Amino acid sequence: MDAYNNPSAVESGDAAVKSVDDDGREKRTGTFWTASAHIITAVIGSGVLSLAWAIAQLGWVAGTTVLVAFAIITYYTSTLLADCYRSPDSITGTRNYNYMGVVRSYLGGKKVQLCGVAQYVNLVGVTIGYTITASISLVAIGKSNCYHDKGHKAKCSVSNYPYMAAFGIVQIILSQLPNFHKLSFLSIIAAVMSFSYASIGIGLAIATVASGKIGKTELTGTVIGVDVTASEKVWKLFQAIGDIAFSYAFTTILIEIQDTLRSSPPENKVMKRASLVGVSTTTVFYILCGCIGYAAFGNQAPGDFLTDFGFYEPYWLIDFANACIALHLIGAYQVYAQPFFQFVEENCNKKWPQSNFINKEYSSKVPLLGKCRVNLFRLVWRTCYVVLTTFVAMIFPFFNAILGLLGAFAFWPLTVYFPVAMHIAQAKVKKYSRRWLALNLLVLVCLIVSALAAVGSIIGLINSVKSYKPFKNLD
């Protein structure tokens, strides 16, 4: 009996059509809210608590100016990139599933390989950095309890390696989530955690200011000859500008986030709104944490006023804030790892399409979770990746200094150059027109910022290597 005479067959056919998008892939269900959660999870990292240090290097005027300037730059370039998700038309064109795909559609050539190297090296570096940062936050909980029991002058030495291993085990489990589309719940939890610890940090800083026990501040930040030497002032100023610029960057995963959105309303419009909310929310927290933290600690602001013990009491609240940091980084790790997982798996699928080990999906029932899909290659490869990144984090606990350098190299091409170049190609901006000149001036200024930040990061890395002692407990 044909479908014409079989209503149930027609209905099942309609259901099959409705369950897929215009590109034949599983129907996307992402919304403005899930995209906003992904962005906030990616952007508001524990680095928000180090912004008081950055403001201390720059001072009140330059510090707040740089914060606002890079918020505007990041939002603007993210809107340009959002319009490139589909090509050639931003609403009806063909979908591009990742950043490399977008660059391939608009620019092509060697720029595709440059994009891939910058993006995926940065993503891998971030996951290693998050492993280290999460362990530092968990160590801080143990040290906070020690200081509470034995006094603030007590020697409280705690190893961060067991915490790194525990973080790695959690990531092995979460890494079995098949793709970015399944991360919404994790990003929402992580976003709530980021609001929690940032709010606690702001509250503690306000309490310190209200108590009158505040540090000395200056319009121009740290004072040469008092707080720092002339050379230290220069290097730390470069590093602070870089830290602020990189703290806004989420374009490395913007296309992957946009690829989770349902097609109506148009993805680019939803992504622009989500970017505005994400960047605006981030900027408010950054200014509050940076400026109030600087007001509280002055030119002696610590690198992180929770894990570096800018505060000791109430210890239970500081413990809770550090636990929130660790929980946030659990989700953030996946937000940055999933695009790299998919990149490797898609390339393996293309290279060995007949391999059951790589391509076959098995259905399995897991207690409390229900029916889950298991792929042997995904299980083995992602487990190996997490084990490797955890091992690197253990060997190089100063990797965050390396991460600053990676951020310097990735910020300019991924956040500024490629979005601007693709916008010029898409909108056919006339060469040497006012708009073309303004866009290229923006590219040049951000290139200089990245270069200066890279120099500052290299100096910091050299100092870290000099004092490096492998497998040493954190004092």
Swiss-Prot record:
Belongs to the amino acid/polyamine transporter 2 family. Amino acid/auxin permease (AAAP) (TC 2.A.18.2) subfamily. InterPro entries: AA_transpt_TM. Expressed in flower buds, siliques, developing seeds and funiculi. Its main location: membrane. Coiled coil: none annotated. GO terms for biological process: amino acid transport. One of its GO terms (cellular component) is plasma membrane. It comes from Arabidopsis thaliana. PANTHER family: OS05G0424000 PROTEIN-RELATED (PTHR48017). Keywords: Amino-acid transport, Cell membrane, Membrane, Symport, Transmembrane, Transmembrane helix, Transport. Residues 142-157, 207-236, 298-314, 399-401, 463-475 are extracellular. The chain crosses the membrane at residues 32-52, 53-73, 121-141, 158-178, 186-206, 237-257, 277-297, 315-335, 379-398, 402-424, 442-462. The lineage of its organism: Eukaryota, Viridiplantae, Streptophyta, Embryophyta, Tracheophyta. This is Amino acid permease 8. Amino acid-proton symporter. Stereospecific transporter with a broad specificity for glutamate, aspartate and neutral and acidic amino acids. The keyword S-adenosyl-L-methionine does not apply. Residues 1-22 are annotated as: Disordered. It is found in: Cell membrane. It comes from the Eukaryota.
